[in-house]
């Protein structure tokens, strides 16, 4: 390998691992793999500027609990437990902030119909073994005084948290490079194979990097890269999300309390529509997010922004005084059952770490730890079973007991029930 930080694009190089994609998943995998002594090449023309850049950074497996997603809930809980140590290690290694907060999530309902949906949400969460604190309208406003008086009731998930994905990505990139990973600011145009095994990638400038392992973490574009044999490509698609960042011009008060309207993440149902507001210590408030099946469209629309601001203002009228700092659209990598695709496939040397949909930031620690362990040992973790590519009929490699395609079909059917019953999107 060349010296740390060298430009690999002009060379034909060899590495232990090539990570394709520099979002929060790819960055985390690259960091963990480099930490265990492997020579890592991370390929992405703009690391951290895909779905990660547009993410709110909610760490809310409990509040996100949904029908047909029990396995994702368990994986999310596992990853949330890892987060404090994950960010502490990251910040110690780099000296960079991540915006990590663990102040909880308050789920609220605006009217009687929304309250019925919130009740259904509570029943679902209890079926997962989670019992949240039920709050009256008065208790909701005591917890968050800036809530509108019309809020009817709430559920408090005290262990939930949030992180700033943009800060997290910057810290992960520095940590990965400090651990020895080499960043190539180019896209991967082809997965190369030889003798029945993935053995490298071709970059946009036509140079080649050979590697023992290729980790496909390219988000919604994972299935579009050339060179994937028939039946191997993971079934990911782009799902558009628009998100708004607001900020206050106020400064920290005399007691050192940061500015802001909210103390914790608030997720609301407003006349059947869902909205979330995620506060940052800086005083920034993130409002999101739409969910639109429009292919690779990344247009910010007046309608999408209006709906988000309308619902957010209904819950927290004070947002009208905030400055608009940023409005962006991103593309989440969705799968037919909303769950990620993690693990090896029938093409030896190729490992999936994609399709994390709404939960990429949340699932980064557990995905990175699990994939890095596989890169070290070559043995699939049984915990991957619900997320094996074989559940879609893709020619993956399944740990014993992995689900088949019929599981994904049942899950996809369950999504329709979830959308009608919970509306927490």
Go through each PLM region and give its residues.
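Short beta-strand to alpha-helix junction loop
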Residues: 74-77, 108-117, 156-174, 299-303
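Active-site substrate-recognition segment that forms the wall
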Residues: 31-35, 45, 57-58, 96-101, ...
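Helical element adjacent to the flavin cofactor pocket in flavoenzyme catalytic cores
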Residues: 155-205, 209-213
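C-terminal catalytic lobe of FAD-dependent flavoproteins
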Residues: 316-425
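Short hydrophobic core segments
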Residues: 18-20, 209-221, 368
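N-terminal Rossmann-like FAD-binding beta1-loop-alpha1 element of flavoenzymes
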Residues: 15-41
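Dinucleotide-binding Rossmann-like beta1-alpha1 core, especially the glycine-rich loop
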Residues: 58-139, 143, 311
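Extreme N-terminal leader/targeting segments of oxidoreductases
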Residues: 1-16, 35, 405-408, 414-422
């Amino acid at each position: 390998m060349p010296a740390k930080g060298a430009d690999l694009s002009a060379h034909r190089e060899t590495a232990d691992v090539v990570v394709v994609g520099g979002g929060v998943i790819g960055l985390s995998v690259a960091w963990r793999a480099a930490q265990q002594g492997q020579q890592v090449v991370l390929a992405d023309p703009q690391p951290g500027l895909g779905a990660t850049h547009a993410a709110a950074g909610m760490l809310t497996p409990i509040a996100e609990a949904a029908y047909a997603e029990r396995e994702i809930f368990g994986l999310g809980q596992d990853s949330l437990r890892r987060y404090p140590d994950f960010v502490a290690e990251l910040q110690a290694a780099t000296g960079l902030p991540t915006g990590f907060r663990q102040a909880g999530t308050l789920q609220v309902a605006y009217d009687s119909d929304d309250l019925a949906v919130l009740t259904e949400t509570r029943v679902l969460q209890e079926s997962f073994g989670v019992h949240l604190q039920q709050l009256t309208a008065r208790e909701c406003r005591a917890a968050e005084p800036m809530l509108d008086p019309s809020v009817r009731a709430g559920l408090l998930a005290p262990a939930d948290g949030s992180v700033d994905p943009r800060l997290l990505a910057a810290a992960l990139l520095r940590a990965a490079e400090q651990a020895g990973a080499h960043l190539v600011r180019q896209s991967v145009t082809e997965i190369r194979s030889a003798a029945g095994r993935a053995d490298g990638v071709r970059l946009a400038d036509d140079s080649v990097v050979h590697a023992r392992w290729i980790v496909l973490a390219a988000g919604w574009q994972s299935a579009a890269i050339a060179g994937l044999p028939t039946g191997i490509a993971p079934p990911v698609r782009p799902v558009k999300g628009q998100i708004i960042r607001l900020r206050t011009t106020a400064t920290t008060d005399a007691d050192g309390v940061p500015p802001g309207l909210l103390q914790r993440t608030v997720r609301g149902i407003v006349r059947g529509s869902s909205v979330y507001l995620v506060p940052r210590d800086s005083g920034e408030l993130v409002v999101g997010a739409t969910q639109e099946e429009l292919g690779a469209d990344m247009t910010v629309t007046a309608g999408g922004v209006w709906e988000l601001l309308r619902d957010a203002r209904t819950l927290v009228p004070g947002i009208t005084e905030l400055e608009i700092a940023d409005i962006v659209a991103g593309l989440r990598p969705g799968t037919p059952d909303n769950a990620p695709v993690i693990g090896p496939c029938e093409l030896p040397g190729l490992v999936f770490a994609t399709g994390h949909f709404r939960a990429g930031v949340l699932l980064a620690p557990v995905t990175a730890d699990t994939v890095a362990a596989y890169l070290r040992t070559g043995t699939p973790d049984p915990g991957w079973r619900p997320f094996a590519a074989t559940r879609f009929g893709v020619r993956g490699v399944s740990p014993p007991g992995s689900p088949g395609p019929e599981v994904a079909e049942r899950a996809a059917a369950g999504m329709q029930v979830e959308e009608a019953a919970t509306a927490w999107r």
